[in-house]
Amino acid sequence: MTFEIKHRDAMGRIGILNINGKKIETPTIMPVIHPNPKKQIVSMDLINKLADVIITNSYITYKTKHLREIAEEKGIHKLIGFDKVIVTDSGSFQLGVYGDVEVEPMEIIEFQERIGVDVGTILDIPTPPDVDRERAEKELEETLKRAKASIELKEERGFKLLLNGTVQGSTYLDLRQKSAKEMAKLGFDIYPIGAVVPLMEQYRYRDVAEIIINSKMYLPTNKPVHLFGCGHPMFFALAVALGCDLFDSAAYALYAKDDRYLTERGTLHLEEIKDLKAFPCSCPVCSSYTPKELASLNKKERERLLAEHNLYVTFEEINRIKQAIRDGSLWELVEERVRCHPKLLEAYRVVRKYIDYIEKFDPVTKKSAFFYTGIESMFRPEVLRHKKRLKRLRYEKVYITTVSSSIEKPYHEHLNVVETDVDILIKDPVFGFIPYYIDTVYPLSQHEIPELFDYEKEINKRFVDEFIDWLKKKIGEDNILDIMTYNYYINYFSANKKINADALRIRKMLQYQYGFDIIDDELMNKIKVVRSKTTGRLRQVLDENGEILFSVRSNDNLLIPSEKGAKLLWKKIPFPKYRVVVNKEAEEFAREGRNVFAKFVIDCDEELRPYEEVLVVNEDDELLAYGTTILNGIELREFNYGLAVKVRGGLKINK
């Protein structure tokens, strides 16, 4: 099995999961298929059309004589009528519902291997929510014991099937953490998070969100995570943003039995909407029937068609989430979805407790602008990261001001400011401060914020006050200028000094982007800039010989180094910061400007964020290449497959 990340936003990722030569693009949904074809509501033709992976129950197959005989003779794929990836549950669901199963833990592993399952599951114990701690601990220990035995059996017997190692622990977050840590040590292929269905049935989405995060924090980043039993599309966006890659759904069929109609915003009963002229959906079912026509059909036909609609809308939401990841707008989609139900909003609000961890996985730049959709946006990773990176700038004199909300961004293009060596900090209702000299950098000019209520402003005011206190300690209170002192200073400055404002802007932008003073006082007098002939905006940074050091990327205004710029960064930034270290095998390829793959990475700056500009070096810190990291500092050390750094250029050895 291999797994690689192609696109990402929040903790969500579009990945390619390769199982036995069959490719699955994640995130995705696994429709639950009954192993008895006669009991399957939706035709396998439609399942084959929509799904790359399904999940079925090996325990039912095992306990049903004629199904077991067919599966053992012809294989599970022939029994189901599905040639792509088949995942099986082991009977844990039945164990949770009925309290007992008539199969031994190792026996069901052997059976899953025997019938040709692609991904099997250990017979874990799904501890329900809110049980007493003693029971939760005891059942977790038994699950871990079975997990270890299952891995040992697989290795000893040379089984081909991949294995799910399910994270348990009831509603005790420390037990979920323990379970994740211990499962991770055993080296499972996929990590489901189990026993959350009762919580979702009770709309306890906050508990589910906390369980996901507390499990994810201790699971390996290079393996997919499956949220067992999550089948309602309105929860997918949040779950993906928290790092879930796989879902399974029996909801499409179960809801249809009760005449329930799934939407991405909730569930409707057919009886409630039968008087509508048309369905709020354009799937083949909803395009062919009116609500009244569908309601008038016999029970069996109505159930089949409703199940088909439910399946279509489920996959539609998955596709919508993937597009949001590609666009860099997943947080906006999440904030739209969580307003579908108060309990979902409650779940989203608990995420702020873990935002320091989530920020590590959130890309530093995105295609889409930051849209403020409610007070929850105040705590998003983009805001947290900016507030931290404000302290990267080198301040000497500071003037703090406000501007009218009618002033367009970037501010420096629309304000009549005498440019001096004073750092002008413009108060912002969400981002705290926007420094005048870096106001083009993402997301400082790429955001939209409505007029805020006073209680929203109060949250930001706390940060503003804390940052001013930090400034006073850093540069001294006398160097935070009031308006009279500032006006006097700029008049004096204009008469007595000259400043290369473009060079100062580049210097500040590099400080913000890298955290180090790349352009020192000597270089300040040597660098030149090239501006766009159409927009007048900065496009290139040149050295004294007219050679390009950096290009200013138009969509986010990050500074992208040339070979000479990369050498400057390497000289100014101490090891291991902004480094990705590769082994000797990859040195020649990196120097030739070829992409760096994860299996060649042996070390890195652990603080790297996705899509940052990085330096590729060898173990002796010799600069080999430069480019954009796809993975963060944690993932670079854990992934062993797929693209790690998209290289822009290599440094060939002069012979």
Swiss-Prot record:
SMART domains, sorted: PUA (SM00359)
InterPro entries per the UniProt record, alphabetical: ArchSynthase1/Queuine_TRR, ArcTGT_C1_sf, PUA, PUA-like_sf, PUA_sf, TGT-like_sf, TGT_C2, TGT_C2_sf
Cofactor binding remark: Binds 1 zinc ion per subunit.
UniProt: Zn(2+) binding residues: C281, C283, C286
Binding site for substrate: D124, A195
Enzyme Commission code: 2.4.2.48
Superkingdom assignment: Archaea
Active site feature: D89
Thermoactivity: Optimum temperature is 85 degrees Celsius.
Signal peptide: none
GO molecular function: pentosyltransferase activity; RNA binding; zinc ion binding
pH profile: Optimum pH is 5.5.
Metabolic or biological pathway: tRNA modification; archaeosine-tRNA biosynthesis
Cofactor(s) the protein needs: Zn(2+)
GO biological process: tRNA wobble guanine modification
Cited CDD domains: PUA_archaeosine_TGT
Catalytically driven reaction(s): guanosine(15) in tRNA + 7-cyano-7-deazaguanine = 7-cyano-7-carbaguanosine(15) in tRNA + guanine
Any one annotated GO CC term: cytoplasm
Domain PUA stretches: 577-652
Zinc in keyword set: yes
Function: Exchanges the guanine residue with 7-cyano-7-deazaguanine (preQ0) at position 15 in the dihydrouridine loop (D-loop) of archaeal tRNAs. Can also utilize guanine as substrate.
Family indicated by similarity: Belongs to the archaeosine tRNA-ribosyltransferase family.
HAMAP family recorded: TgtA_arch
Protein name: tRNA-guanine(15) transglycosylase
UniProt lineage: Archaea, Methanobacteriati, Methanobacteriota, Methanomada group, Methanococci
